[in-house]
Regions:
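Compositional signal for N-terminal targeting/processing segments
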Residues: 1-176
Length: 176
């Protein structure tokens, strides 16, 4: 963590899971592409050109930005009045490519782990946008490994009760 840029909520949302896994001697992998590589793609018109050779190993072997439901959902989210910033279409396309780069790397990492650990259940934690409705990472993992049973569990705060659940299972919680 000393050389990484973990999410601001790492200590509260991720560290307890990582520590639990360590305590129980369960394997943990960092499935995602490093943030600076996704940022490079977003800032460089969806291109990986210019990434130093030593970091290329951290990129997915294959990446694609699919048309359809995921793209529509992404563009709607990023174009909504609540979006953090307004972006011109070309920039939005590059940011979508960076999002897909993350999905591809996570799917490849999970698939590689599944190949190396036959019959082991895998718990993958990601932001809900990456797997809601079996899109994003879930969709790409299902394409890489159609024989895997992928189940999406969506945590929702009780005050979001009216929202349509986007997972196979929903865990309702109250924020303290």
């Amino acid at each position: 963590l000393a050389t990484a840029r973990p999410w601001p909520n790492y200590r509260t949302d991720y560290a307890p899971l990582v520590n639990f896994a360590k305590e129980k001697k369960m394997p943990v992998i960092a499935a995602n592409v490093p943030r600076f590589l996704a940022a490079h793609v977003a800032k460089n018109n969806a291109s990986t050109e210019g990434i130093a050779e030593q970091y290329l190993q951290w990129l997915p072997k294959h990446t694609y930005a699919p048309e359809g439901a995921y793209k529509d959902k992404f563009y709607a989210q990023m174009s909504s009045p609540a979006a953090p910033m307004k972006m011109p279409p070309q920039r939005l396309a590059a940011v979508y490519a960076a999002q897909c780069l993350k999905d591809d790397k996570m799917a490849e990492s999970i698939a590689a782990f599944a190949d190396a650990h036959q019959n082991m259940q895998i718990l993958h934690i990601n932001g809900c946008f990456h797997s809601d409705a079996h899109l994003g990472t879930a969709q790409k993992l299902e394409a890489l490994h159609p024989e895997l049973k992928v189940t999406v569990i969506t945590p929702l705060e009780r005050k979001q009760k009216g929202e349509k659940p986007a997972g196979d299972f929903v865990v309702w919680f109250d924020r303290k």
